[in-house]
Amino acid sequence: MSLCHRNYMLAGLGTLIVILSGIASAETKYTVVAPPVCVNNLGESVSFFSRPTTQGRVAAGMANRDNDGNPVIYRANYEKATPAFQKFVDFHECAHHQVGHVDQPHPPRNSYDHLMNESIADCVAILRVREEDNESYRLVIDGLVDAMTAIGFPKTSTDSRISNVTNCYENYGSSAEFIEGVLNSERAR
């Protein structure tokens, strides 16, 4: 595993567990949804692996490359999140592969670049919700609010994230067009 991928994994894991959490009561168990189709910006199919833990109380995902360099998404504790929120997390993690974040050095946590990467992934994710599972939009928004509130994010952070997701959902074209715009912007750098 390259240093870039290792740093992405280590820095991203903590952030994604906190940012992408669907919290449910300890007794609530949901059916785990099948992962969506995910192909990265290099045309490689992304594999999903479940890694349930006995200690985790939140659902989380992490986009990375495995030790052999294959693109992967690790899913943890999905049975603790609603199916709608599970799909959003999968789409969000897939987006990190689709726009090439996984193959770039991971920016410092909470830096402008890190937050921009997360906003981009949220936007792609909600566009895919609109395209593939539109009836779950409200459930995704509710899941984000519930999770961020339960974790202790300030209301301003929650409101900002919901505003970004809603703006993407209401005002952008397809996820493919959005991804192409991000990739073109990266190429122009």
Task: Explain the meaning of each model-derived region.
Residues 50-83, 94-102:
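Active-site scaffold of zinc-dependent metalloenzymes
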Residues 131-189:
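Long, well-structured alpha-helical subdomains associated
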Residues 2-12:
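Bacterial N-terminal signal peptides that target proteins for export
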Residues 26-68:
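Auxiliary, metal-adjacent structural segments of Zn-dependent hydrolase domains
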Residues 111-137:
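Post-HExxH zinc-binding segment in Zn-dependent metallohydrolases
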Residues 80-85, 89, 111-119:
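Soluble non-cytosolic domains of exported or imported proteins
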Residues 21-23:
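N-terminal signal peptide c-region/cleavage motif recognized by signal peptidases
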Residues 94-111, 128-133:
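Catalytic Zn2+-binding segment of zinc metalloproteases
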